[in-house]
Amino acid sequence: NDVMLIVEQAQDWWWFWGNDELDETTNIHSFDIAEGGQTTYAGSGRINGTVLDQFCLSEFEGEIRVASTTGQWNRWWMADPEPMENHVYILEQTQDSAGNNTLEEVGHLGGIAQNERIWSARFVGEMAYIVTFEQIDPLWVIDLSNSSTPTILGELEVPGVSTYIHPLGGGHLLTIGIGPSNADGTGLDWSKTQLSLFNASNATDPTLESVIGLSPVIDTDDGWSWGYSEATYEHKAFQYWEADGLLAIPMSIQGYYSDTKEIDGRLYYASGYEYISKLMLINAK
């Protein structure tokens, strides 16, 4: 609560056009907000790759931890772009020879999940939890207790992908995301919202304790339905009451229906759309 981090792309969006040698980098600026009504600049640093969201950032005991993705997957004109891979950087505030405040890299773990990108991340104390995805979702459990040598302790592959990670304590994680599209657990079906409960208390052997799918919700034999939850991309729509172990998330369902009826020997056909908003309550102890 005493540190504010601001992240920006180090280059304008067009900077790499026509130059395949340059890679994306990210600037990180740290500010001390411990004193009420006052903000003090603490230092800046730069890492390789791009940062997904605020949960890929963390400050813990004076160190800045960042999860990023590198690669040239968005350069469609290249015949052989660099593959994606993921990283965890640990930065520490220091001063350079000119006396300027900087954030210096003191630890780095690279090569995580080649050809995949980060879909969600969460730093909890001396641990980091990262979800990557290509065809199936690996959950990575990373030990940050030694800043100079962050280490992968465990990995678990599960169907679908988690887009938000909510720590429950004791190494348990409650996640929301997208369910798989294929029977073998691969791919993504964007009409399926999926909740998962992980147990990573044994960091070297994380397990999936429970999973539940929430959509589509409309059951119909003469049409189709499609549903999603805003909580899959907006964490403020994910509300968890720890005392009762109760999760509340919104659901939006869209359905198409059609029907044919015979009245006085004539056939009448009707079709249309239904839009339903629901608040889903889930026992997630």
Whereabouts are the PLM-identified features?
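Feature marking well-ordered beta-strand scaffolds used for ligand recognition
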Residues: 1-285
